[in-house]
């Protein structure tokens, strides 16, 4: 019965089409399969980018589609680059990026180093550590909003237990000083497991015979760590920093859930400011210029970083 089905399928396939496919070169067949994907990428990514660039030179407003659209040249870009509020937003974003990356790399590598050393309950501990990464930012935001509650939040009571500061005397989300750190803590809790997994992959890729040779040469554990482990794991660490840096630069949902950009503008990151300009103030041309500036910034920094990463890999 199976043979009869195959025979019917073979008869249903036009012989001329089969001959044409067999007559194509490998390169031509590759283009046949790749072309739909390229067209899809052009439609989803390239065309909107070109359209955004065009809008950035106009005064277009999406809530006034019938209004006259005027060409304003570089005025939008000039206003953005000379606006002190924009630079304050950039500073808040840089603060968030620096501390989240620092904490995630240090804690993530430390956890990877711990888990790489086999012990009882290793698999269970790994599963528990990875759990936060599996949650959505909205869930994490709600979870930490509850933890930060001055009256009933466990975070405030933990601070009181270790420092003696009354739990009700401070608010992580309502304080201008503490609000940025509340986001750093929540994001670190959520994404440190990602860095840990990448570092763990790097640690487990190091052959055992390298450490055995070091033991024969009587190299101390400290020297093995700094001269062997760190250099071999460094490309993995840099890759984790690249991924997390790009994602944190685009951070939106977790911040909106926790602080909404407040209090004041202390946690107003570039992504939130861009959303306000585009969909609350409806300054589409201005926000398009802002988006292009952010795109060029991220693309430029990522390109420089990737070159540095490639040099590290070539060592």
Spans of features found by a protein language model:
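Short, Lys/Arg-rich, polar N-terminal cytosolic tail immediately upstream
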Residues: 1-24
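A structural signal for multi-pass alpha-helical bundles of membrane permease subunits
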Residues: 26-315
């Amino acid at each position: 019965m199976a043979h009869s089905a195959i025979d019917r399928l073979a008869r249903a396939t036009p012989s001329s089409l089969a001959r044409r496919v067999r007559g194509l070169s490998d390169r031509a067949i590759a283009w046949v399969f790749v072309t739909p994907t390229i067209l899809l990428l052009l439609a989803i990514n390239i065309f909107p980018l070109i359209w955004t660039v065009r809008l950035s030179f106009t005064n277009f407003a999406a809530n006034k589609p019938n209004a006259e659209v005027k060409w304003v040249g570089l005025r939008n870009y000039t206003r953005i680059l000379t606006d002190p509020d924009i630079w304050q937003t950039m500073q808040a974003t840089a603060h968030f990026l620096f501390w989240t990356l620092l904490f995630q790399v240090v804690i993530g590598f430390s956890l990877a180093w711990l888990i790489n050393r086999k012990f009882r309950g290793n698999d269970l501990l790994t599963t528990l550590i990875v759990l936060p990464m599996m949650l959505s930012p909205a869930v994490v935001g709600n979870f930490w909003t509850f933890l930060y509650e001055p009256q009933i939040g466990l975070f405030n009571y933990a601070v009181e237990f270790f420092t003696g500061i009354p739990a009700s005397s401070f608010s992580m989300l309502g304080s201008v000083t503490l609000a940025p750190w509340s986001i750093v803590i929540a994001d670190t809790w959520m994404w440190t497991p990602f860095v840990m997994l990448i570092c763990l992959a790097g640690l487990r890729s190091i052959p055992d015979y390298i450490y055995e040779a070091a033991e024969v040469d009587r190299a101390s554990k400290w020297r093995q760590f700094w001269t062997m482990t760190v250099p071999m794991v460094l490309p993995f660490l840099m890759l984790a920093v690249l991924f997390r840096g790009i994602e944190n630069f685009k951070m939106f949902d977790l911040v909106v859930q926790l602080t909404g950009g407040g209090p004041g503008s202390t946690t107003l990151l570039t992504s939130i400011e861009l959303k306000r300009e585009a969909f609350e103030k409806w300054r589409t041309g201005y926000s398009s210029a802002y988006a292009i500036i952010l795109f060029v910034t991220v693309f430029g920094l990522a390109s420089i970083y990737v070159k540095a990463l490639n040099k590290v890999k070539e060592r």
